[in-house]
């Protein structure tokens, strides 16, 4: 499969700390990136690492380490044709540090339709789980939604915004999907990607806070951008047409 190519443009610097859990890498094979779970899978999963690296080089000014971690984790995960667990990314930092920007970029360069893809699922506690008294219903609905969409397409992305506002019981529903196992609730979930966004504090594995992991990444010299962007032209970014 030939990866789709998009152009990039500078959007400014961003991001606090990135915590990553990924599967080990195997031999690089673009054909393995296609969604192949079930005979009726219609995933629009079309990773464009050149575009992602180009945009991250523009966006993460002074955050070379963060950029490298994101790309390294994604490549390692996607190179493995049979990962033992999903990829879990936790983005956290102060308001305005660009956590949502990074998640939008990932969706944009992994799926043909970006955040509009039917296989990218964006949850906000304020919008989707506003009433604490409805927790049990939310737990049932969330489990059913994740399970059902992974059955349709194992290459799905689940984005959870404002994790600091999410009821703890909902995290418990997600916990079985985040670990190492072959099947959960009869569903193959090991090729999924989960992104958790939290204000300031780090989100530990399975929703537990990780002490001593807050604060901005140390600034490092920005890598030359010309090499990444030399072959690219025109507007791009999440929401761009193309």
From Swiss-Prot:
InterPro entries: P-loop_NTPase, Torsin. Keywords: ATP-binding, Cleavage on pair of basic residues, Glycoprotein, Hormone, Nucleotide-binding, Secreted, Signal. Residues 1-26 form the signal peptide. Coiled coil: none annotated. Pfam families: Torsin. GO terms for molecular function: ATP binding; ATP hydrolysis activity; hormone activity. GO terms for cellular component: endoplasmic reticulum lumen; extracellular region; nuclear envelope. Residues 27-189 form a propeptide. Its main location: secreted. Disulfide bonds: none annotated. Glycans are attached at residue 149. ATP binds at residues 93-100. The keyword Nucleus does not apply. Gene3D superfamilies: P-loop containing nucleotide triphosphate hydrolases. The keyword Kinase does not apply. It is found in: Secreted. Salusin may be a endocrine and/or paracrine factor able to increase intracellular calcium concentrations and induce cell mitogenesis. Salusin may also be a potent hypotensive peptide. Belongs to the ClpA/ClpB family. Torsin subfamily. PANTHER family: TORSIN, TORSIN-2A. This is Prosalusin. The gene is TOR2A.
């Amino acid at each position: 499969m030939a990866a789709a190519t998009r152009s990039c443009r500078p959007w400014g610097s961003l991001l606090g700390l990135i915590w990553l859990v990924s599967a080990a890498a195997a031999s690089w094979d673009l054909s393995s990136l296609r969604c192949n779970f079930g005979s009726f899978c219609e995933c629009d999963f079309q990773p464009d690492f050149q575009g992602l690296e180009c945009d991250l080089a523009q966006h993460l000014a002074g955050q070379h380490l963060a950029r490298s971690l994101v790309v390294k984790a994604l490549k390692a995960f996607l190179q493995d044709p049979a990962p033992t667990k999903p990829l879990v990314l936790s983005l956290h930092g102060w308001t305005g540090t660009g956590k949502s920007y990074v998640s939008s970029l990932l969706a944009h360069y992994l799926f043909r339709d970006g955040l509009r893809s039917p296989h990218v699922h964006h949850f906000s506690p304020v919008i989707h789980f506003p009433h604490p008294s409805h927790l049990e219903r939310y737990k049932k609905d969330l489990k059913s939604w994740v399970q059902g969409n992974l059955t349709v397409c194992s290459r799905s992305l689940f984005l959870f915004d404002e994790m600091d506002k999410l009821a703890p019981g909902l995290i418990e529903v997600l916990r079985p999907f985040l670990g190492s196992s072959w099947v959960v609730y009869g569903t193959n979930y090991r090729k999924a990607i989960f992104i958790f966004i939290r204000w300031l504090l780090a989100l530990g594995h399975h929703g537990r806070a990780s002490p001593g992991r807050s604060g901005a990444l140390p600034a490092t010299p920005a890598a030359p951008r010309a090499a990444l962007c030399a072959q690219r032209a025109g507007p791009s970014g999440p929401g761009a047409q193309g």
